[in-house]
């Protein structure tokens, strides 16, 4: 999932920055292109020239959000101790500490129909997290099936904690889910 941000003009970058803040803070459906254009200091025509449609702008927002989060995630992985899969909780907790409206991808999934042009960015983000967790769990689990199963458990724990974090602005669910994941990952591998 790569964005075209490097090829964006300064005006397009500003539009994307403003739209990202508004979509996350107020919700995708609550924010119109008039508001985005006005707060970006551009005309609607410029917005449409740069992105083509609000749907394409939403997709760009989600791709950008993924890249920023992924960068933070990989930085944490690089310095983590075993089991490194637990850093997923820290990465989401860091993100949630900076913002308190929950997961941008879960929020977008709640607003967008599955056939929306931007929905694939949601699926790609969640699948990338799931796949990376499987790689990290496999570092400590030689059996690929067991590693995949445990990674799925960790993924579901973190997803549930993310949703709960967005509901009540508490870190407790994330801490509890992390403890459960540690218990799962600290158990002896199942003999095959």
PLM segments and residue spans:
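Hydrophobic alpha-helical connector segments
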Residues: 60, 71-101, 146, 150-154
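Basic, helix-initiating cap at the start of DNA-binding domains
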Residues: 1-26, 30-39, 56
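Hydrophobic/aromatic-rich alpha-helical bundle segments in the mid-to-C-terminal region
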Residues: 118-123, 140-192
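Amphipathic alpha-helical segments used for helix-helix packing
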Residues: 97-119
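Amphipathic alpha-helical packing segments from all-alpha helical-bundle domains
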Residues: 67-70, 74-76, 83-86, 115-141, ...
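HTH DNA-binding helix-turn interface
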Residues: 25-28, 41, 48-64
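Short alpha-helical elements of helix-turn-helix
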Residues: 13, 17, 45, 103
């Amino acid at each position: 999932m790569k964005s075209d941000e490097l090829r964006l003009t300064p005006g397009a970058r500003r539009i994307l920055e403003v739209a990202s803040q508004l979509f996350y803070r107020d919700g995708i459906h609550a924010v119109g292109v008039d508001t985005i254009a006005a707060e970006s200091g551009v005309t609607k025509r410029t917005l449409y020239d740069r992105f083509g449609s609000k749907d394409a702008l939403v997709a760009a927002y989600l791709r950008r959000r993924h890249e920023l989060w992924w960068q933070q995630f990989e930085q944490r992985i690089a310095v983590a101790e075993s089991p490194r899969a637990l850093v997923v909780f820290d990465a989401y907790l860091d993100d949630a500490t900076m913002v308190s409206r929950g997961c941008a991808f879960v929020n977008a999934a709640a607003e967008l129909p599955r056939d929306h042009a931007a929905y694939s960015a949601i699926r790609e983000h969640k699948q990338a997290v799931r796949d990376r967790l499987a790689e990290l769990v496999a570092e400590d689990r030689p059996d690929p099936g067991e590693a995949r199963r445990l990674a799925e458990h960790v993924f579901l724990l973190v997803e549930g904690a993310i949703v709960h974090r967005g509901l009540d602005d508490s870190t407790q669910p994330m801490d509890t889910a992390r403890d459960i994941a540690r218990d799962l990952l600290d158990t002896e591998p199942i003999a095959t």
